[in-house]
């Protein structure tokens, strides 16, 4: 499934894998874009899979003419060995009935590559929130049981809120309670599979609505940064400036090109 760019397979032992879910507003994918661009991560390979719709395009992180002609495909892997980070970016939607197969293959690769844990950046429909969720922060997290032991103290210190359980069938008052992530794509499947396989996984998500979701992506990646400290403020004083996230060059065309002047 994983195909390296070079002749040898990179050593990812004890790396943290960051990846998005293809979810409402594409918030996770935009957040991963910010991480790759800000850290100037190096592409180390891609996934050869029939589970996603094929696509090809220009390098979304091009900074100069020399690398603007590089091609990108639907699933690519980037790494930053100095921070023990590896990132999987997904750029297209799943083919019908193929998402579960992708999750199984992905987790098999994670186990074989020696990655220490997975962090999934996702989103969920804001209109599905209950009253308690409406009155609190829009961010939630989930941890698999085997990850809770090692990070629960850190998470507790951040005062984060865990994703609440809701009725499996909302229309039935006697329905059992379970984790539901409407609009979350493969998030729930990945989480359930990781629980059953005892893989260390965290899910960080935000309740959002469709639209201009760049602010949601920035806030989600800053939520992640509270935990991992991927980047730090320019100064530590009370007037510390905003974190210096680097916007990818491809975001200039996020909503298409401008209106032709001839229209006016």
UniProtKB/Swiss-Prot annotation:
Which branch of life, at top level? Answer: Eukaryota
- Modified positions (Phosphothreonine) are 137
Q: Which InterPro entries match?
A: Proteasome_assmbl_chaperone_2 (IPR019151), Proteasome_assmbl_chp_2_euk (IPR016562), PSMG2_sf (IPR038389)
Q: What is its main location?
A: nucleus
Compartments where found: Nucleus
Annotated GO molecular function terms are: molecular adaptor activity
Question: Which GO terms are recorded in the biological process aspect for this UniProt protein?
Answer: chaperone-mediated protein complex assembly; mitotic spindle assembly checkpoint signaling; negative regulation of apoptotic process; regulation of cell cycle
Q: Name one GO cellular component term.
A: nucleus
Under the subunit heading, UniProt states:
Forms a heterodimer with PSMG1. The PSMG1-PSMG2 heterodimer interacts directly with the PSMA5 and PSMA7 proteasome alpha subunits.
Biological function: Chaperone protein which promotes assembly of the 20S proteasome as part of a heterodimer with PSMG1. The PSMG1-PSMG2 heterodimer binds to the PSMA5 and PSMA7 proteasome subunits, promotes assembly of the proteasome alpha subunits into the heteroheptameric alpha ring and prevents alpha ring dimerization.
The entry sums up its family as follows: Belongs to the PSMG2 family.
**Full protein name:** Proteasome assembly chaperone 2
**Which species is this UniProt entry from?**
Mus musculus (Mouse)
Name of encoding gene: Psmg2
């Amino acid at each position: 499934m994983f195909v390296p760019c070079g002749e040898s397979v990179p050593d990812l032992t004890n790396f943290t894998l960051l990846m998005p879910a293809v979810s409402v507003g594409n918030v996770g994918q935009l957040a991963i874009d910010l991480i790759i661009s800000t850290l100037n991560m190096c592409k180390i390979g891609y996934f050869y899979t029939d589970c996603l719709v094929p696509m090809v395009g220009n390098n979304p992180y091009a900074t100069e003419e020399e690398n603007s002609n590089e091609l990108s495909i639907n699933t690519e892997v980037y790494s930053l060995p100095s921070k023990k980070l590896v990132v999987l970016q997904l750029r297209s939607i799943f083919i019908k009935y193929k998402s579960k197969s992708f999750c199984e293959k992905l987790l098999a690769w994670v186990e074989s590559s020696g990655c220490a844990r997975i962090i999934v950046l996702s989103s969920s429909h804001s209109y599905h929130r209950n009253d308690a969720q409406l009155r609190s922060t829009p961010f939630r997290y989930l941890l698999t049981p085997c990850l809770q032991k090692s990070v629960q103290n850190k998470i507790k210190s951040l005062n984060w809120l865990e994703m609440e359980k809701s009725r499996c069938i909302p229309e039935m008052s006697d329905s059992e309670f379970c984790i539901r992530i409407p609009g979350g794509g493969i998030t729930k499947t990945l989480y359930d599979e990781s629980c059953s396989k005892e893989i260390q996984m965290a899910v960080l998500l935000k309740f959002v609505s469709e639209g201009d979701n760049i602010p949601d992506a920035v806030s989600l990646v800053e939520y992640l940064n509270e935990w991992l400290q991927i980047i730090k403020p320019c100064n530590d004083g009370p007037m510390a400036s905003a974190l210096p996230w680097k916007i990818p060059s491809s975001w200039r065309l996020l909503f298409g090109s401008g209106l032709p002047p001839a229209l006016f």
